Structures are given as C-alpha cells and as structure tokens.
Design a protein with these regions (language model features):
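N-terminal export and membrane-targeting signals
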Residues: 16-35
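N-terminal intrinsically disordered, acidic low-complexity segments at the extreme N-terminus
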Residues: 1-15
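N-terminal capping/interface segment
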Residues: 1, 17-21, 57-63, 93
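C-terminal region of N-terminal signal peptides and the immediate post-cleavage residues
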Residues: 24, 40-62
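Hydrophobic alpha-helical transmembrane segments of multipass integral membrane proteins
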Residues: 36-39, 135
Length: 186
C-alpha cells in the first residue's frame, strides 16, 4: 500500500483527525478524571483530614490525672527491692505480689476516673485498662510459676501478633502518659 492509498483509506474510514479538533475520547475523559481525583485527595489529605493518632484522646483531662496517678505508682514500685536482691524464687514472688498489687490499685483508680464508656474517649480508655488487666493477670500467672519453683522467663499475652505491653505502652505514649507504660520490673 502506497502513501496515496493509505491517505484515501484514512478518509474513507473517517480515521483522519481534524487538525483543529481536540476531541473528548473516553481515554482522555478517564485520564482527566483520575488526575482531578488524585489532586482532590491530596488537597483533602493536607488541608482537611483528621490529625493525630486514632488512639489519641480528645479531652486531655483524663491523661493529666492518669499521668499523676501512674507516676505515684512508679515511685511506690521503686521502693520494692529489685529481682537481683531476692534470696530465692519465693522471695521474688513476694516482691512481685507487692508490685502487682500496686499496679492493680493504680488501674482501679484509673478506672474510677475514666471517661464514660459511652463516648469515644471512654471506649479507648476502657480498652487500654482491659490491656492493663491482662498484663496484671500475666504477672499473677508468673507469680504462681515462681511459687511452683519454675524459674522461667516472664511471658505476657499476645495481642495482634505482639506482646500486650506494646499496645499498652503505645496508648500511654500517644496520650503523653509516660509513667503509665508497663514498668518493666519483672
């Protein structure tokens, strides 16, 4: 096929683009919509999207009170002899009973001052305190093992593929309550 035949074929099948016509082809429309959609998304993301972490409390009143209560509990924990000072496994278990009771009292106090569970902050705090309850139960299991003569590593319950202390500590960090992290005294 020579050039003249090719030109005639284009005209006969109406395939020749008009030099002055841009045209709204489906591909162009889809492309423009995609670009506009991406631009709108990034505009929203930078200007109007919610800020902060999903676990961050809206009202800081609880976090201020909780940090104060947790700091008091940490001071009490520091008064208990360390594991290295324990004479034997029973002595270590006795130390852990004291520290676990301190933490249980702290959690009970935090629960009393927690926001209502019917609001978002209350739901978040309730889940966090439930994690504390799990951690305290793990400590009690460890105490029982020490009393039974088992000198094993302290293990905590897993949650979402990680130790229960990870979400517990993350919530405390996000809400600026560093004293409310797991103490690491075991």
């Amino acid at each position: 096929m020579d050039d003249d035949e090719f030109e005639r074929e284009l005209e006969r099948n109406n395939l020749r683009p008009d030099a002055g016509s841009w045209g709204w082809t489906p591909g162009r429309v889809i492309g423009i919509l995609l670009v506009l959609g991406m631009a709108a998304f990034w505009l929203w993301a930078f200007l109007w999207s919610p800020r902060g972490h999903p676990d961050e409390l809206d009202d800081p009143a609880f976090t201020v009170a909780a940090e104060t209560r947790c700091a008091t509990a940490l001071e009490e924990l520091r008064e208990v002899p360390s594991a290295g000072e324990a004479a034997d496994l029973n002595d270590r278990a006795d130390q852990l009973v004291i520290t676990t009771d301190i933490l249980a009292a702290m959690v009970a106090d935090l629960r009393e001052g927690a926001p209502s569970p019917t609001i978002r902050d209350g739901e978040l705090v309730s889940r966090w305190l439930d994690d504390w309850d799990t951690y305290i139960a793990d400590r009690n299991i460890y105490i029982d093992r020490l009393r039974a003569g088992e000198d094993r590593i302290f293990e905590v319950t897993a949650r979402d593929g990680d130790q229960i202390t990870s979400p517990l500590d993350l919530f405390a960090t996000i809400n600026r309550m560093p004293s409310c992290q797991a103490p690491g005294d075991v």
